[in-house]
């Protein structure tokens, strides 16, 4: 896992350069958003169970066919696996949010996901929708708590959504 600071420093170290205005600006941006990142991570941590329940409820309300015979969440085992995956997306997105880098999402979530989902015949559309729902629910909570930095929350979730949408699962 690599955070935003390490990524910037590594990039400059590899080219043997001192930090220029661009690098300093990136570091300033990361540090200025630090308290908001921590507050958002705390909200996610404190409300993870409710966020997950709400996302699952909305997903299955929108797509009830997933719970019917033949659906990808039909049977207790498949339903539990779906909820577990949604929890993984939330947890790893919170790590990416705090680190200011989507690197962990690539390493721990996205790499190998295509093969896994293909082997299990898991459709990508409900997965993408569940990630969108997680983002929307968190953004609503941030609005209630007067935290305006939605760009911070959008970055990891949009990275997951874009990467999954690009894959031919």
Swiss-Prot record:
Write out the similarity annotation: Belongs to the phycobiliprotein family.
- What is this protein's name? Allophycocyanin subunit beta-18
Residues noted as binding (2R,3E)-phycocyanobilin in the record, renumbered to the chain: 82
Q: What post-translational changes are documented for it?
A: Contains one covalently linked bilin chromophore.
Lineage, top-rank taxon, reads Eukaryota
Q: Would the keyword Plastid be found if you checked this record's keyword annotation? A: yes
Residues modified as N4-methylasparagine are 72
Under InterPro entries, the record lists:
Allophycocyanin_b, Globin-like_sf, Phycobilisome_asu/bsu, Phycobilisome_asu/bsu_sf
UniProt key word Metal-binding? no
Its membrane topology is listed as:
Peripheral membrane protein
Q: Which PANTHER family match?
A: ALLOPHYCOCYANIN BETA CHAIN (PTHR34011:SF3), PHYCOBILISOME 32.1 KDA LINKER POLYPEPTIDE, PHYCOCYANIN-ASSOCIATED, ROD 2-RELATED (PTHR34011)
Q: Where in the cell is it found?
A: Plastid, Chloroplast thylakoid membrane
Query: What keywords sit in the KW lines?
Result: Antenna complex, Bile pigment, Chloroplast, Chromophore, Electron transport, Membrane, Methylation, Photosynthesis, Phycobilisome, Plastid, Thylakoid, Transport
User: What taxonomic classification does the UniProt entry list for its organism?
Assistant: Eukaryota, Rhodophyta, Bangiophyceae, Bangiales, Bangiaceae
Q: Which species?
A: Pyropia yezoensis (Susabi-nori)
Question: Which biological process, per GO, is one annotated for this protein?
Answer: photosynthesis
A single GO CC term for this protein reads: phycobilisome
Q: What does this protein do?
A: Light-harvesting photosynthetic bile pigment-protein from the phycobiliprotein complex. Allophycocyanin has a maximum absorption at approximately 650 nanometers.
Oligomeric and partner information: Heterodimer of an alpha and a beta chain.
């Amino acid at each position: 896992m690599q955070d935003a600071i390490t990524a910037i420093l590594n990039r400059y170290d590899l080219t043997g350069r001192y930090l220029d205005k661009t690098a300093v600006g990136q570091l300033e941006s990361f540090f200025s958003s630090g308290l908001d990142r921590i507050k958002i991570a705390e909200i996610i941590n404190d409300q993870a169970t409710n966020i997950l329940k709400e996302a699952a409820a909305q997903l299955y309300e929108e797509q009830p066919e997933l719970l019917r015979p033949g659906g990808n969440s039909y049977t207790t085992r498949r339903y539990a696996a779906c909820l577990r995956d949604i929890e993984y997306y939330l947890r790893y997105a919170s790590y990416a949010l705090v680190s200011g880098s989507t690197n962990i999402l690539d390493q721990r979530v996205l790499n190998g996901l295509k093969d896994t989902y293909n082997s299990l015949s898991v459709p990508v559309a409900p997965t993408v929708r569940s990630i969108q729902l997680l983002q929307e629910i968190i953004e609503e909570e941030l609005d209630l708590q007067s935290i305006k930095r939605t760009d911070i929350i959008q970055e990891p979730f949009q990275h997951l959504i874009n990467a999954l949408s690009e894959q031919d699962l």
